[in-house]
C-alpha cells in the first residue's frame, strides 16, 4: 500500500496517533464487539442456561451448574484468548484505513 505524504491529507486526519494505534474509545469498541461476537458464538450455551434458570427458579444454582459451567467455559474461551480481541482490533484498524483511503481519493479527485 502506497503512503500518501500530502500535508493536507495528514492535517485532515484527526488523530495524532499512528493509524494502527487504537484510541481508548476504539479499544472499548473492540471489546464491546468481542463481547457481542462471543455471545453469538456461545448462543446455544447461553440459551441452555437461560432455559434451565427459567425452569428451576430459585433452585437455579445447584440444578443448573452443568449449563452454567458450559456457558462460562465457552464465553471465557473467546474472551480470554488474545487472538479474538486482536481480530476485533484489526477490524477497527481496517475501517480506519478504508476511511483514510476514501479521504485521500476524495482529496485527489478535487485537485
From Swiss-Prot:
Q: Which InterPro entries match?
A: Cyt_c_biogenesis_Cmc1-like (IPR013892)
Subcellular location per UniProt equals: Mitochondrion inner membrane; Mitochondrion intermembrane space
Quaternary structure, per UniProt, is: Interacts with CMC2.
Positions of short motif Cx9C motif 1: 42-52
- Its domain of life? Eukaryota
Q: Does the keyword Ion transport apply?
A: no
Alphabetical UniProt keywords? Chaperone, Copper, Disulfide bond, Membrane, Metal-binding, Mitochondrion, Mitochondrion inner membrane, Repeat
Ranges of residues in domain CHCH: 39-82
Which protein, by its recorded name, is this? COX assembly mitochondrial protein
Family, similarity comment: Belongs to the CMC family.
Task: Please give the biological process terms from Gene Ontology that the record holds.
Answer: mitochondrial cytochrome c oxidase assembly
What is the name of the gene encoding this protein?
CMC1
